[in-house]
Regions:
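Short beta-strand motif preference
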Residues: 45-47, 160
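Short glycine/proline-enriched loop/turn "hinge" motifs that connect secondary-structure elements
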Residues: 37-39, 48-51, 92, 191
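Structural motif
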Residues: 43-44, 98
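Divalent metal-dependent hydrolysis catalytic cores, especially in the metallo-beta-lactamase
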Residues: 44, 57, 133
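Conserved non-cysteine loop/helix-boundary elements of the Radical SAM core domain that shape
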Residues: 63-92, 96-226
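A short secondary-structure junction motif
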Residues: 14-17, 55, 64-65
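Local cysteine-cluster metal-coordination motifs and their immediate loop/turn environment
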Residues: 47-63
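Flexible, acidic/Gly-rich N-terminal and inter-domain linker regions that tether
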Residues: 1-43
Length: 226
């Protein structure tokens, strides 16, 4: 069962659906089909923030490695236009029960940029009060004030990147992150009212072994993620 590769499913539509024949008109046709049977069905939205300060060697996501925050400002300008166009195509009721910010590193955005993005979302979509609003967080670039802002903007679920706490593994994959700074972010999330906090781990990384990964699991259990 687990001795062969499976599809890498991260979002819908999956990347292999975006072929040359899939043009703007095809997208509009897809979106128009939502009206069939009523437009009251709730939506799930995914926003991709591709920017990262440094590269993690294991990462296969669509990413842009840069320390130039001017690039994210330009990206948000076009993302706001895309939000407006998608909302117009969907028409009717645009109630959202799930929203997720992934990347890349969503917290690459400045506080003002994060406010700008969520204002654009709320201008064109209705986020229901009891929805699930999630964001991926890099503990190396987040402080209490950032977590507090995310809570104020309506986020209630946080996914914290860890992968492994073993220092030699972290060095091998170019992602050095201490247990303490990880715990600080998770404690901040709980203090500011996040309903759920998860932690991402990867097995099969360079330098890992059963003993070291078991130690990482024990540290994760000590934090007690949801």
């Amino acid at each position: 069962k687990f001795d062969s590769n499976g599809p890498r499913y991260t979002s819908y539509p999956t990347a292999d659906r975006f072929v040359e024949a899939f043009n703007a008109e095809a997208l509009r046709t897809w979106l128009a089909k939502r009206a069939v049977g009523g437009v009251s069905k709730p939506l799930s939205l995914y926003f991709h923030i591709p920017f990262c300060n440094t590269i993690c060697y294991y990462c296969a996501c669509n990413k842009i490695i840069t320390k130039d925050h001017g690039r994210s400002a330009k990206y948000l300008k076009y993302l706001a236009k895309e939000i407006e166009m998608q909302a117009a195509c969907l028409g009717g009721s645009r109630q959202v029960t799930q929203l997720h910010l992934g990347g890349g590193t969503p917290t690459f955005l400045s506080h003002d940029e994060m406010r700008e993005l969520m204002a654009a979302v709320r201008e064109h979509f209705t986020l229901v009060p009891n929805g699930e609003y999630s964001i991926e967080v890099d503990p190396r670039k987040v402080d209490f004030e950032t977590v507090q802002l995310l809570a104020e903007l309506g986020f209630n679920r946080m996914s914290v990147g860890v992968q492994d706490f073993a220092e030699d593994v972290q060095q091998a994959v170019n992602r050095v992150q201490s247990y303490d700074e990880t715990k600080l972010v998770i404690d901040a999330a709980r203090a500011t009212g996040f309903k759920s906090v998860s932690m991402d781990l990867i097995y099969g990384l360079p330098k890992q072994n059963v003993i070291s990964f078991n130690r990482t699991l024990e540290q994760v259990l000590a934090i007690s993620p949801d």
